[in-house]
Amino acid sequence: GKILTKYFGQTLGLTIKSTAADFKTKADVESEKEILSILKVKLPQYNIHSEEEGKLDNGSEYTIIVGPLDGTNNFVMGIPNFSVSIAIIKNNETIAGVIYQPILNQTYFAEKEKGATLNGKKIKVNNIVDRNQITIAYNAGYKTARDCVARIINDLIKSKHKRIINNWSPSYDYCLLASGKIESIITDLGTEIYDYVAGKLIALEAGAKIMDINGKRKINNILDNFIVSNSERTNKYIFSIINPTEK
């Protein structure tokens, strides 16, 4: 967090990754380097899958997923909506996740079957189910088909609810859901694992419910393409919007 705070507001050079909208900065690289240096000392036997450096296979059943700066575009533009995301996976099941928002000094944390916290205090999803009052976040990866994105957003706009948001920092969206600030998140195909795996566990441990895009309840795992909401009722409503033939 200190590295990101140090560079926030500065003009940084960009290195393009997959598309013009997908890039990294000196802040991404240095943040990841610092995190990895700590992990390799504290948990040297674990595998590591980090956003910039890729995969380090130590033959362990545990893998640490590292997103050193989720919301790079916001960061570069001087928008204080970004976070650091770290999760621990055991045999493809997420068992712990932490997301840190350095500007607000917020640490969201969860362990499987132990609940979720914000700065050490328990948090829970809200109980809003009135479709006119729900806020929906929609996250799609850089490789998600544009026509698919356009269709879903158009369907959401035509539906009657409070608001649709895309904060450009998917990890933090799960924190908003977990702390009762929003009601639902749609995560589409192509979203990177660093952007959702820790947040998904935090939301679920705060009481959120999950459903895959085919309408089936889905346990916490590393797969993308799902709906997670404050209730099963909200999930079913969102599912009916993005799958109109299922209404």
Give residue ranges: language-model regions.
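A short, compositionally biased
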Residues: 10, 82, 110-114, 204, ...
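N-terminal subdomain of lithium-sensitive/metallo-dependent phosphomonoesterases centered on the IMPase/IPPase/PAP
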Residues: 1-69, 247
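Residue-level signal for inorganic ion chemistry
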Residues: 4, 28, 39, 72, ...
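DPxDG-like acidic metal-binding loop motif
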Residues: 58-117
